[in-house]
UniProtKB/Swiss-Prot annotation:
Gene this chain is encoded by: RBL4
Ranges that cross the membrane: 64-84, 147-167, 175-195, 201-221, 231-251, 254-274, 300-320
Pfam family membership, one: Rhomboid
Subcellular location: Membrane
Name the UniProt record assigns to this protein: RHOMBOID-like protein 4
Origin species: Arabidopsis thaliana (Mouse-ear cress)
Superkingdom of origin organism: Eukaryota
């Protein structure tokens, strides 16, 4: 999956006038941590093509040149490079991975197995920190966190998925609608994440990418009359989403961002991706009365989705800035993001340690697990202390 795959025709379900098929593989999304990166690729056979007006040979649906999604990918990569420059592991931490990269070397893999910066750097660069959003009036973090990534692995998986899904959607629906779908879905994922995961720094574009999947699914429902192999397409999409959400219950994964992004994208798909029904396209140039452009069910879905979407954003933002903890109103919801087992814990409390400096010796105790350690360090920086604390508390 990459640039080569993105050159194939934009396709989804079979249309009712002519058919063309092509096979593509969708890589399961990383989603916010290395746990989901281990997911296997799922293959998806798509078969969508623009159909022509009868007797005229004129394409009803315009094909767009996809430029916005590649720009999003370039922006994400650029932000990651800047983040690694700011991180400057050799100077701030000392214990780095891939030292030959110099200033761009990664944090120790015990601290960040995704090959990326420290959590402190991610926070500085605009990661989603609920305390800073609510008490520090830094609401912009609800948007900025979608452009940051925890590491090379995280970035690679999200960008491959974005290219594969996003380019095809932009070809069919244009940069305005797909750009709005991507950005608003990421924002919706951030809001839900902030309501339920209140003690972690959250970053990643997975919520926005899940929004594209949600839009794909709702687009089939809203444009039901123009496709012939709807059931197969819907089942395939649902399985892809279910697998990725299932991977999201592993520890360290922000599944609430995925759920929020998918739900937002699903509702937005009804609003942004609506198309004229088959009968209108087939009969509009023929004799007799002209049918309505959209069917009644399309108008109903459009209206209901828009109302739910607006109401959801209003309630979510009001709750967030009134410091409402979603877990207090839903005792079981935390299982949607992590299910504890004998193999792992779902403790999401941030690493916190007590330290004592005597000469060149730094003594540290993790308040989460009670582990203690001593280090020979003279005047360690705050970043170095934070890095050691994170490793000790793992």
């Amino acid at each position: 999956m990459g640039e080569k795959d993105s050159e194939t025709a934009p396709i989804w379900g079979k249309t009712r006038e002519r058919e063309r098929s092509n096979n593509n593989n969708i890589q399961p999304m990383d989603l916010e941590s290395s746990s989901s990166v281990s997911g296997q690729q799922r293959s998806l056979t798509q078969s969508r093509s623009s159909y022509e007006e009868r007797g005229r040979g004129v394409k009803e649906f315009r094909s767009w040149f996809p430029w916005l999604i590649p720009c999003f990918v370039v922006a994400n990569v650029a932000v990651f490079v800047i983040t690694m420059y700011v991180n400057n592991c050799p100077k701030k931490s000392g214990d780095c991975f891939a030292d030959f990269l110099g200033r761009f070397s990664f944090q120790n893999t015990r601290e960040n197995p995704l090959l990326g910066p420290s959590s402190l750097t991610l926070q500085t660069m605009g990661g989603l920190d609920v305390k800073k959003v609510v008490k520090g009036d830094e609401g912009w973090r609800l948007l900025s966190c979608n452009w940051l990534h925890g590491g090379v692995v995280h970035l690679l998986m999200n960008m491959l998925t974005l290219l594969f899904i996003g380019i095809r959607m932009e070809r069919e629906f244009g940069f305005i609608r797909i750009g709005l779908l991507y950005l608003i879905s990421g924002f919706g994922g951030s809001i839900l994440s902030a309501l339920f995961l209140r003690s972690n720094i959250s970053v990643g574009a997975s919520g926005a990418v899940f929004g594209l999947l949600g839009g794909m699914l709702s687009e089939i429902f809203i444009n039901w009359t123009i496709y012939s192999n709807k059931v197969v397409t819907i089942v395939t999409l649902v399985l892809i989403v279910a697998v990725n959400l299932g991977l999201g219950v592993l520890p360290g994964v922000d599944n609430f961002a995925h759920i929020g992004g998918f739900a937002t994208g699903f509702l937005l798909g009804f609003v942004l991706l609506i198309r004229p029904h088959y009968g209108w396209i087939n009969q509009r140039n023929g004799p007799g009365a002209k049918p309505h452009r959209f069917k009644i069910y399309q108008g109903i879905l459009w209206t209901i989705s828009l109302l739910i979407l607006v109401a959801g954003f209003i309630v979510g933002l009001i709750s967030l800035f009134n410091n409402v903890d979603g877990n207090e109103h839903c005792s079981w919801c935390h299982y949607l993001s992590c299910v504890p087992t004998s193999k792992w814990s779902c403790n999401r409390e941030p690493a916190s340690c007590t330290t004592t400096q005597l000469g060149n010796q730094l003594s540290m105790t993790c308040l989460r697990n009670g582990k203690s350690a001593s280090y020979i360090l003279a005047n360690p920086s705050d970043s170095r202390i934070n890095s050691l604390c994170v490793q000790l508390c793992r």
